Amino acid sequence: MAALPRGSRGLPLLPLLLLLPPLGGPRGADGYFPEERWSPESPLQAPRVLIALLARNAAPALPATLGALEQLRHPRERTALWVATDHNTDNTSAILREWLVAVKGLYHSVEWRPAEEPSSYPDEEGPKHWSDSRYEHVMKLRQAALKSARDMWADYILFMDIDNLITNPDTLSLLIAENKTVVAPMLDSRAAYSNFWCGMTSQGYYKRTPAYIPIRKRDRRGCFAVPMVHSTFLIDLRKAASRNLAFYPTHPDYTWSFDDIIVFAFSCKQAEVQMYVCNKEVYGFLPVPLRAHSSLQDEAESFMHVQLEVMVKHPPVQLSRFISAPRKTSDKMGFDEVFMINLKRRRDRRERMLRALHEQEIDCQLVEAVDGKAMNTSQVEAMGIQMLPGYRDPYHGRPLTKGELGCFLSHYNIWKEVVDRGLQKSLVFEDDLRFEIFFKRRLMNLMRDVEREGLDWDLIYVGRKRMQVEHPEKAVPHVRNLVEADYSYWTLAYVISLQGAQKLLAAKPLAKMLPVDEFLPVMFDKHPMSEYKSHFSPRNLRAFSVEPLLIYPTHYTGDDGYVSDTETSVVWNNEQVKTDWDRAKSQKMREQQALSREAKNSDVLQSPLDSTARDEL
C-alpha cells in the first residue's frame, strides 16, 4: 500500500468533511435513503380578512371608493365582504347590489344587509345629522360585522367608511405588518382633519395637543399610540385582547357621549388595548366632515373635492370597472368662455387640469400657451416687444425672463380673443392650480350677486397672492365674498369682462412689458412702484378679488415637484443669461404669509357655503 504524502498523514476527518459542499444543495436534502430526502416548507397563506362597509346615501362616492378597494393587493379568495346599507334616499342599494353581484365570485364570501325602508331616522334633522338613533343603529351594524368576522374565524377585520379612499394598494399588508391589535392608516384631507385624535378629555371629547400637527403633517413618521382612531382601521382578531372589544352594547361603566367612535375607544381602553395610527406612507384620503345642516349635494361635492385633491400629487383614483358611473354634463358656468392655458410640453398638467374640470362638469377651451423659452430674439423684436424701462424683479433684481414673456403673451392672446369675439365675461385658468371645495357653486353664486347688484367690474381675481398685508381690503357692499383688490401677485385664475380686456389692450403693454401679475396691479393703480405706473395711463381697471379665495397653487417654492416655467429660464433678450434662482429661494411663489388680525378682510359678507365644510378637528 502506497504511503501517504509527507504532511498529510494523520489529518483529522471532521475538518475535511466540513470542506465538502452540502449534499442537498439549496433545494433540500437528497439523502441516500428515501426517508432522508426533504423539500423546503411552502409559505403561509395570506391571512383571512373581512372588510366591513356601511353605506348611506353614498351613490356619488361608490364608483371611486369601490374602485380603490378593488386595487388592494390582498388575495381576494382570502378576503370576505360584509356590506350594509339603509335609510337611503338615493340609489346606493342598487349600486352596491350591482357591484356585489359582479364581484361575489372573486371574493371568499359576501354578506349583504340592505334595508330599503325607512329612508330617515325619526329624530334626525337631515341626512347629515347624527341623531342618537342613528348612532345606535351604526354601532349595532359594526357589532354585527365584528361578530361575522369572529364566526368565520377571520384573522383581521378592516372597517372602512364608504367615503374613505384607500389609494395605497399595499395598505392592508402594511397595517398587518405592524402587528397591532387596533391600527389605522393616517388618511389625508384638505385641512388638518384626519382619522385619529392625539388627546381626549376625561369626558371623552377631542382635546388639542402639540403632538397632533407634527404627526398629521408627517414631520414625525412612524406608528403612534393614540387615544382614538376612526373611519378606517384594522383589528387583529388573533390577539386574545380583541375578544373583549365591542361596539354595542356600550360598556357598563360608559358615561361619555353617545357616539360610535367614542364608545369603541372606551371599549379599547377598558380592554387595555392601545390604538395606533401610522403615517409612514400616504395611504389614502377622506373628506372633512360636513355640518348637520348640510345637504346631500354638499356631501357629493365634498367627496368629489377629495378626488381633486388626490390628483394634485398622485394619480387619479381608478373607478370600479364593475359598476357604471353616471355620465357628466359639462357647461361653462354661465360664462361666455372658459379658457385654460397650458404649455404643450406640460402634458401632465394638461391632463390633470382637464380631468379636474371634467369632474366638476366645467367645459373649457384649451389655449396653447406661448413657450417663451422657444422664442428667439428676432421673433421678439418682430412683435415689437420691449421691456418696461427700469424694470427689475423685486426679489432678484433681474430683468424679464423668457418664461415671463411667454406667460404674458399667453394672457395677452386671450384678451385679444375676448375682444375679437365680443365675450362679455370669461373665466381664465392657468394649469398649476388646485380648487377649493364647492368651487363651481361658490363662483356661480358670486357672479349672480355681482349681476344682481349691477357692479361695474373689469377683472375679478379667483386665485392670487395678496401682497398688501398692512390693512384690510375694502369689502364690496351687498355682494358676498368680494373685496376691492389691492396689490396682488399671480394670475392663477380670474374673471375678465369685455370692457376689462379692452382696457388692458389699449394700454399697449407689448411696447413696455413687465410680468403679467405686475402689469395688472399697475392697471388698477395699486402697484407700489410709481415709476412703473407712470408709463401707463389711464389706470382705471376695476379690479376685485374673491374672498376667501377659491383657487390656490398646486405647489409652492420648496415643495416636492415644484417647477416654474416663468422664472426658471433665460433673460428675455439674452439667451446666455440664465435665471435659475427660483428653484430654491423664489419669494414670489412662496405661500401667502399669515395675515395679522388687523389686516384680515373680516368685513366681507359671507355665504352659507363658507361655513358648510367644517375644518375643525
Swiss-Prot record:
Residues 582-601 have a biased composition (Basic and acidic residues). GO terms for molecular function: procollagen galactosyltransferase activity. Its EC number is 2.4.1.50. InterPro entries: Collagen_mod_GT25, Glyco_trans_25, Nucleotide-diphossugar_trans. It catalyses: (5R)-5-hydroxy-L-lysyl-[collagen] + UDP-alpha-D-galactose = (5R)-5-O-(beta-D-galactosyl)-5-hydroxy-L-lysyl-[collagen] + UDP + H(+). A motif (Prevents secretion from ER) lies at residues 614-617. Residues 582-617 are annotated as: Disordered. One of its GO terms (cellular component) is endoplasmic reticulum lumen. It comes from the Eukaryota. N-glycosylated. Keywords: Endoplasmic reticulum, Glycoprotein, Glycosyltransferase, Signal, Transferase. Residues 1-31 form the signal peptide. It is found in: Endoplasmic reticulum lumen. Glycans are attached at N91, N179, N376. GO terms for biological process: positive regulation of collagen fibril organization. Its main location: endoplasmic reticulum. Pfam families: Glyco_tranf_2_4, Glyco_transf_25. Beta-galactosyltransferase that transfers beta-galactose to hydroxylysine residues of type I collagen. By acting on collagen glycosylation, facilitates the formation of collagen triple helix. Also involved in the biosynthesis of collagen type IV. Belongs to the glycosyltransferase 25 family. This is Procollagen galactosyltransferase 1. The lineage of its organism: Eukaryota, Metazoa, Chordata, Craniata, Vertebrata.
